[in-house]
Amino acid sequence: MKRTRGFRLGVYIFKDAEIIDYAAPYGVFSVARRLDPELDAFLVADAMKPVQTQAGLTVHPNYSFNDQPDMDAFLIPGGFGTRQETNNKRLHQFIR
């Protein structure tokens, strides 16, 4: 993918993720973007399909692992859902 100039943060969303754990950092970037419009935050999931969070909210990713979006940092939020992600080989492969 074509590289943009500003800092890009990929935020991982997965089944049973805690909303606050990915929405808060995403929100901070949206506020910071007012000062630096080149900052970018986006959601990345294992596949390009809706993801249901722990609270039942359905979230749509901007990218999938297959897209391999260009980013400077990749945030994996915490919460109960992370237990299942420790064995996600596609996630491990994506991080490398």
Range-by-range predicted roles:
Residues M1-R96:
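Extended, subdomain-level signal for the structured scaffold at the beginning of enzyme domains
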